[in-house]
Amino acid sequence: MAEAVAAPISPWTMAATIQAMERKIESQAARLLSLEGRTGMAEKKLADCEKTAVEFGNQLEGKWAVLGTLLQEYGLLQRRLENVENLLRNRNFWILRLPPGSKGESPKEWGKLEDWQKELYKHVMRGNYETLVSLDYAISKPEVLSQIEQGKEPCNWRRPGPKIPDVPVDPSPGSGPPVPAPDLLMQIKQEGELQLQEQQALGVEAWAAGQPDIGEEPWGLSQLDSGAGDISTDATSGVHSNFSTTIPPTSWQTDLPPHHPSSACSDGTLKLNTAASTEDVKIVIKTEVQEEEVVATPVHPTDLEAHGTLFGPGQATRFFPSPAQEGAWESQGSSFPSQDPVLGLREPARPERDMGELSPAVAQEETPPGDWLFGGVRWGWNFRCKPPVGLNPRTGPEGLPYSSPDNGEAILDPSQAPRPFNEPCKYPGRTKGFGHKPGLKKHPAAPPGGRPFTCATCGKSFQLQVSLSAHQRSCGAPDGSGPGTGGGGSGSGGGGGGSGGGSARDGSALRCGECGRCFTRPAHLIRHRMLHTGERPFPCTECEKRFTERSKLIDHYRTHTGVRPFTCTVCGKSFIRKDHLRKHQRNHAAGAKTPARGQPLPTPPAPPDPFKSPASKGPLASTDLVTDWTCGLSVLGPTDGGDM
């Protein structure tokens, strides 16, 4: 009985069992929550995949649509190619492209032309159309060429009869080249127009090389140039502006009707032009104008028209000689004037220049001109330096009188001859002198800006502000001494020896306003004021350095030319500046002993002869350059008699 009764369960055991069950339930609940989260993430990913599948489907549909469009365009292109092939099989069709708004037309005077002129025109027309070949355009052969080949009078538009229909052209201003009929399925592309412009720029050299020699034509040799054949189109008028020629009027001008005054040029030649319609092609042949910029003097357009100058679009103007000028040049031994890329047109070339001899030429430098530094150059010296031994300042190296730069004739009047080196040319309103008249011509009437600084008291004007400041102090002095009574005005740069020079001597008026320093001469005050203002009015033409004094600029310029005019009589060393030579001579006097009485001094080395070639020790050749040891300029030998 006692065994049947179960042992009582301990409360501690029950509590432990309950706690274990609770922990298990909590773990199961946490696991269930994690499974729910993972399920939500899987659902989101599934939704994203569905969206991506929909987008792929849309893109695939778009790709299929584009592919269908490409297939349709390919079919259109294939049919277009077949149409072009069919057109090419017919020999009556030419592939060409005409300029915008133009068509081929022959001269109205076709019946009055000779056979050789008709043949020349036929070659020009055929070459023009062959040059403009392009696969983008396919139209029938022009009627003008068909009539020319058959020997008929071309392009008689007024004559009744069947006429080949023209290609329809869009009259709008931005339509471009002529558009063929829609049944040809030809559309003008922008690339074709760019190709035509490139052909115009290159001058169609291949066409010019393949044409027959114009020199074999019976009507002349000198009317056409090697560059004839270049094609360019004027978009405004539709004219081939790079084709024009001048044909001698003696051959067929007399047969033309008298009511064509525009056919003859100003120089007696005749242009082979077509009808003056802005919508038609004007086929002419012209001498190609070489693109050279004339830097000499500006030329008025009327002067060029008087000489029969022909102009082309985008090309620089150039002189063409008149018959009178050609005769004058041929009488002097040359056919054309000598050209210089810097100086432009000069006087007619002389026979000695054609034989290889050189002539002195000085290019005008930019700011400042060369005359501001050396006072003008003709044979290598200026008004501050003596000419080399053996040369007369009034004549050339060979003793010949100077020639006029205008007509090349010798000057016989002594009053018109160039002045000597010690008589500088004066420009009105300027105190600076120049060594020769060409230098005076090249020198401007006034420096850039003129004389902008004016005194309010006396009305005098000055070029520099420091000059005006110094003048105002002397003009408004308490003792009343002005530029006329003081020691020279600042504008003139004179000394202090005036009649009323008290202000210049005591320095009461010549005082620096910045530092209070007094000076006895206005030039010294001006030079001192430049230190405060930083003005350096003398720039170097070789480098970017500027100087306050002209003498310093000349000394600096000798470092560029390599000239050392000051030579020591003891050792023969040369120096750029005179003070360097004096310092060197003091070193000789301090280190060397004085020779005894009666003992001869050492003979100094002879200075180099400026007209002896260093290599041959003989007379200077015409192509050798000689350095002027007096002023540091390079000049040519005396055998060259050409003017600058």
Curated annotation (Swiss-Prot):
Biased composition annotated in UniProt, kind: Basic and acidic residues: 347-356
Biological processes annotated in GO: negative regulation of DNA-templated transcription; negative regulation of transcription by RNA polymerase II; positive regulation of transcription by RNA polymerase II; protein heterooligomerization; protein homooligomerization
Cross-link type Glycyl lysine isopeptide (Lys-Gly) (interchain with G-Cter in SUMO2), residue numbers: 282, 286
Gene Ontology molecular function: any one: zinc ion binding
Keywords assigned by UniProt, alphabetized: Coiled coil, Cytoplasm, DNA-binding, Isopeptide bond, Metal-binding, Nucleus, Repeat, Repressor, Transcription, Transcription regulation, Ubl conjugation, Zinc, Zinc-finger
Localisation: Cytoplasm; Nucleus
Pro residues bias: start-end ranges: 162-176, 601-611
Sequence ranges of Gly residues compositional bias: 479-503
Coiled-coil segments on the chain, per record: 16-92
GO CC aspect terms: cytoplasm; cytosol; nucleoplasm; nucleus
Pfam families: KRAB (PF01352), zf-C2H2 (PF00096)
PTM statement from Swiss-Prot or TrEMBL: Ubiquitinated by PRKN. 'Lys-48'-linked polyubiquitination by PRKN leads to degradation by the proteasome and may play a key role in regulation of neuron death.
Region (Disordered): 153-176, 324-370, 472-503, 581-623
Domain spans labelled KRAB: 96-167
C2H2-type ZnF: 453-478, 510-532, 538-560, 566-588
Family statement drawn from the similarity comment of this UniProt entry: Belongs to the krueppel C2H2-type zinc-finger protein family.
Complex formation: Homooligomer, heterooligomer with ZNF746. Interacts (via C2H2-type zinc fingers) with PRKN.
Additional information: May act as a downstream effector of PRKN and contribute to neurodegeneration in Parkinson disease cases caused by defects in PRKN: its accumulation due to the absence of PRKN, followed by up-regulation of PPARGC1A, could lead to the selective loss of dopamine neurons in the substantia nigra.
Function statement: Transcription repressor that specifically binds to the 5'-TATTTT[T/G]-3' consensus sequence on promoters and repress transcription of PGC-1-alpha (PPARGC1A), thereby playing a role in regulation of neuron death.
Descriptive protein name: Zinc finger protein 746
Provenance organism: Homo sapiens (Human)
